[in-house]
């Protein structure tokens, strides 16, 4: 039996993690975010009602679940307050269900200003960040000048630290980027206005998780973005600023690494990517447009159109290695309904003609990489909302089986629609 279950994306994000986390939290006592910030966009549809969460864990809608934001998450007080208000306006008692690590780095206005100034300065070489200050906040953390939730307990010292760090960043903004300085007093006043709310939710997350483990409580760890955006293992520099892989669970929450029992990789039935960066199977034809339209591939956070392409099992195999995946949840299978044929990328052809079965590491090494495809018959029948494996067309079952063969990982869950009821759980991670 797996008490500590990790749910993470195996591609470039947007795989459908939010729905699956929400579904599986029916049995969980805690749901933990361990990396990223409000650059994530988790969309839940329950009884036809849509909820988009960016920072608060997807378990917040469950009455008997405690949601936790771990130390690996960079926390924007403004974004958190906005999200809390939206949920509280709908009658959800967020403050009774949400806990924070005091070690969460804070995202403040100057981080956002830096993020946008840098993207503007990069011009055509822009990374395609969400412009929400995520990267600069992680930089401050590593440089040991960042302000954290725990600093808010001593307001006088916080004000002094803020003044010092803002002098540093404003100098950079004005003199290097030729941008406007950020107003110190406004940042201080805005942060102080919510300081007591934030500190009232602080808990020792590592200790809480260890006690939960000893009691045998079920805990779900909710990843943001996807494996191929990992700061260390992704398509650098076109990556996010955190560890999106399973290793980030231990460092971003304080759970001992030996206590992870099951890692569920969310796998979209095709590939998508937002922003710049390598994408060997990207489609620029009618099929690419079809996938975008049928899959409603527009970012929950930015509204940007996602790039679309065939499923890349070479890249997914890298995710299998990095995360020691226990099983997959296959999502958006229904988007492929109606295609005469479906393709799987099974290898890459390098510019020198070599065939390789593993992904390059740096973004520059992906240049000129061509996908080698295996083509399979598609299906005309609808898989939307199918709740039993026997109801799937044979061609869809063949597609699922081939993914399992190419990756060496079983597909334990199949999602056939956005609602939590439109799901087949073949093997429950908490029972694995």
UniProtKB/Swiss-Prot annotation:
Substrate binds at residues 300-306. Its cofactor is Mg(2+). GO terms for cellular component: cytoplasm. Pathway: Purine metabolism; AMP biosynthesis via de novo pathway; AMP from IMP: step 1/2. The active site is at residues 14, 42. GTP binds at residues 13-19, 41-43, 306, 332-334, 415-417. The keyword Endoplasmic reticulum does not apply. Plays an important role in the de novo pathway of purine nucleotide biosynthesis. Catalyzes the first committed step in the biosynthesis of AMP from IMP. This is Adenylosuccinate synthetase. It comes from Shigella sonnei (strain Ss046). The lineage of its organism: Bacteria, Pseudomonadati, Pseudomonadota, Gammaproteobacteria, Enterobacterales.
């Amino acid at each position: 039996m797996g008490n500590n279950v990790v749910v993470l994306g195996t591609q470039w994000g947007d795989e459908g993690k939010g729905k699956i986390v929400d579904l599986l939290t029916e049995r969980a006592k805690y749901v933990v975010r361990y990396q990223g910030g409000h650059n994530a966009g988790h969309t839940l549809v329950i009884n036809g009602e849509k909820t988009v969460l960016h920072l608060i864990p997807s378990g917040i809608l469950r009455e008997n679940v405690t949601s936790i934001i771990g130390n690996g998450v960079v926390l924007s007080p403004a974004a958190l307050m906005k999200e809390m208000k939206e949920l509280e306006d709908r009658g959800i008692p967020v403050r009774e269900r949400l806990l924070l690590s005091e070690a969460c780095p804070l995202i403040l206005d100057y981080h956002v200003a830096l993020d946008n100034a840098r993207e503007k300065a990069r011009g055509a070489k822009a990374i395609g960040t969400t412009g929400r200050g995520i990267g600069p906040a992680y930089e401050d953390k590593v440089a040991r000048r960042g302000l954290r939730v725990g600093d808010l307990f001593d307001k006088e010292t916080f004000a002094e630290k803020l003044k010092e760090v803002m002098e540093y960043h404003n100098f950079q903004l004005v003199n290097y980027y030729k941008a406007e300085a950020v107003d110190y007093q406004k940042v201080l006043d805005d942060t102080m206005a919510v300081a007591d709310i934030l500190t009232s939710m602080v808990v020792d997350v590592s200790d809480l998780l260890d006690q939960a483990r000893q009691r045998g409580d079920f805990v779900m760890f909710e990843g943001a973005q996807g494996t191929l955006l990992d700061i260390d293992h992704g398509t650098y520099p076109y990556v996010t600023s955190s560890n999106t892989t399973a290793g980030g669970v231990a460092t971003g929450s304080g759970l001992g690494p030996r206590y992870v029992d099951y890692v569920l990789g969310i796998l979209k039935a095709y590939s998508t990517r937002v922003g710049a960066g390598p994408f060997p199977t990207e489609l620029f034809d009618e099929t690419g447009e079809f996938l975008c339209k049928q899959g409603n591939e527009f970012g929950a956070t930015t509204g940007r159109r996602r790039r679309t392409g065939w499923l890349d099992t070479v890249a997914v195999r890298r995710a299998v290695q990095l995360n020691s995946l226990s099983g997959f949840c296959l999502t958006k299978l229904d988007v492929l309904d109606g295609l005469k044929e479906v393709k799987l990328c099974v290898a890459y052809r390098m510019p020198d003609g070599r065939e390789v079965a593993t992904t390059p590491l740096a973004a520059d090494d992906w240049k000129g990489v061509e996908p080698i495809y295996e083509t399979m018959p598609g299906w005309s029948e609808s898989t939307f909302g199918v709740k039993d494996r026997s109801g799937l067309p044979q061609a869809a079952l063949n597609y699922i089986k081939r993914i399992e063969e190419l990756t060496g990982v079983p597909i334990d869950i199949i999602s056939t629609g956005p609602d939590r009821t439109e799901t087949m759980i073949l093997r429950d991670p908490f029972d694995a």
